[in-house]
Amino acid sequence: MNATYRHITVLLEEAVSALAPREDGCYLDGTFGRGGHSRALLEKLGAGGRLLGFDKDPQAIQTGKALAAEDGRFVIVQRSFAELGDEVRARGLEGRIDGVLLDLGVSSPQLDDPERGFSFLNDGPLDMRMNPGQGISAAEFIANAAEEEIARVFKEYGEERFAKRMARAIVQRRQERPFERTADLAEVITVANPAWEKGKNPATRAFQGLRIHVNNELGDLERGLDAALESLAVGGRLVVISFHSLEDRIVKLFMRKHAKGEADNLPRDLPIRSKVFEPRLKLLGKPQYASEEELKANPRSRSAVMRVAEKLR
């Protein structure tokens, strides 16, 4: 990457505060990115504190390695946070993590660097993979998927109401030549979109759906939440920042499910109720959003919502 793309960490102080960091605590940043949350958290930890960072992005890993070289309390791992359970177990830390942070937003360097293929505003190769060395690219998916599958991805993951029209236009155009550039795909999608939303690029939802599918973002989120709960110590905090309704719905339902427990599903006249049916999480406060001040400084924070829970057992 030749250019430097600035990233502003969303809900920085709020997220670190929500973790209630202890100086000698052991924490996990499941979405290291460019290290904004990790650096702020390290400032709260003492000499005995530890922080484990995860990311799939090779550029994020380079940033993480630089931070690890200057601060021995930090370790960076090139894995999806969906695999954090395996890593935590391998390090003998299961049930000993004091806080897990997941910031689910795509970082600005990823969005703004045309070579990563995420942007419909800046032309680049149609890739969209968080880790370009793994999985199929967006171009490969668009080239080989059936029209119905493309429409499903746009509708299910992008919540795009004109998904079928867009998929049909894509399949018709790819018979002439393959899609290799983001601008090329964005142009076809734009023409197929008959009703643009004011203030929103007509390719926004379709590109979101494609990115989520290529990176299995929702599946990873479900696995990561389960693994985070098992990794936490009793009293440990789970802090999740999501950026669209599909993510937030998964986070909300997960936290509510474990805050409610399974007692309601049992017969009322049972003489003894096992603890395995009791709640595992306690919800802490209401969802938090970016302040007016943060919105002015970083418009991309407008869709961020943070939810916090504490492990009970």
Swiss-Prot record:
InterPro entries: RsmH, SAM-dep_MeTrfase_MraW_recog, SAM-dependent_MTases_sf. GO terms for cellular component: cytoplasm. It catalyses: cytidine(1402) in 16S rRNA + S-adenosyl-L-methionine = N(4)-methylcytidine(1402) in 16S rRNA + S-adenosyl-L-homocysteine + H(+). Its EC number is 2.1.1.199. Its main location: cytoplasm. Keywords: Cytoplasm, Methyltransferase, rRNA processing, S-adenosyl-L-methionine, Transferase. One of its GO terms (biological process) is rRNA base methylation. This is Ribosomal RNA small subunit methyltransferase H. The gene is rsmH.
